[in-house]
């Protein structure tokens, strides 16, 4: 009997959760759940998977009101799981998405805080509200870390820092190993929030994978609320968000002349 794709995928998702890659596990789980609804069953051999099935699955997702970004995410999750099975010689070689058009969303210009607003926010006196001070520090730490995701930020361990280098294992990126320069500004932020655990910041307190994900989500939500209050206090043109930190970092790098560095 051929190996079942759903059973194989569930095992992969369990491994993702066991290694702390909760975001990856959640995305794969959502894609698998939708595929099950489309098929009306939870059994599917690798031999039954086909380009035609993926085309029909895409049409079904579109017909059920899924956004293009969601359709693309789900199809790529199924494709990635299949490719992993290929590498393990469990599934035959098959270009599962060959010919399926998955147009990238049009790149919309993201509104960012101006440099003057960033300075105003950075040096504002927020000492009367610890939650706002913490939110600001996490916002700028994310920028200093090249726009690190909050999930990855929460998972940084003290042992990841060696001298002037931070090397961490990303929960959301592939390849997962990321190295950035560790500087005085980042150290100053870390010093303000001593952690009693192996993690750099006091965000994750549990060893349970599911509880970890909830802790991260709760702190992220509190930061989002605090950033909205900061926007009002600092008279910012837009509300700062953790999602914009990568674009702010890229803008800063793009504005630097290489000839002034080398």
Describe every region a protein language model picked out.
Residues 126-129, 167-177, 210-219, 237-240:
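Short, contiguous acidic/charged loop-to-helix segments that flank catalytic cores in large enzymes
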Residues 10-23, 32-109, 124:
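N-terminal core-binding DNA-recognition domain of tyrosine recombinases/integrases
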Residues 155-191:
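Conserved tyrosine-mediated DNA breakage-rejoining catalytic core shared by Y-recombinases
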């Amino acid at each position: 009997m051929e190996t079942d794709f759903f059973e194989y995928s569930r095992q992969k998702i369990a491994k993702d959760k066991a290694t702390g890659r909760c975001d990856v596990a959640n995305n794969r789980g959502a894609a698998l759940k939708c595929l099950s609804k489309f098929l009306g069953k939870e059994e599917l051999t690798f031999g039954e998977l086909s380009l035609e099935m993926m085309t029909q699955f895409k049409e079904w997702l579109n017909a059920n009101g899924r956004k293009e970004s969601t359709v693309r995410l789900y199809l790529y999750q199924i494709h990635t799981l299949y490719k992993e099975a290929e590498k393990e010689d469990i599934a035959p070689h098959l270009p599962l998405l060959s010919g399926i058009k998955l147009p990238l969303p049009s790149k919309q210009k993201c509104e960012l805080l101006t440099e003057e607003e960033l300075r105003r926010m950075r040096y504002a006196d927020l000492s009367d509200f610890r939650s706002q001070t913490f939110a600001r520090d996490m916002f700028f730490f994310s920028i200093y870390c090249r726009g690190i995701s909050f999930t990855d930020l929460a998972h940084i361990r003290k042992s990841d820092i060696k001298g002037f280098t931070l090397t961490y294992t990303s929960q959301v990126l592939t390849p997962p190993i990321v190295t950035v320069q560790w500087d005085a500004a980042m150290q100053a932020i870390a010093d303000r929030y001593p952690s009693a655990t192996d993690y750099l910041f006091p965000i994750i307190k549990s060893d349970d994978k599911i509880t970890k994900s909830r802790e991260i989500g709760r702190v992220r939500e509190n930061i989002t609320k605090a950033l909205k209050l900061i926007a009002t206090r600092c008279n910012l043109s837009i509300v700062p968000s953790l999602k914009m930190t990568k674009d702010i970092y890229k803008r800063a790098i793009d504005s630097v002349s290489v000839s002034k560095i080398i």
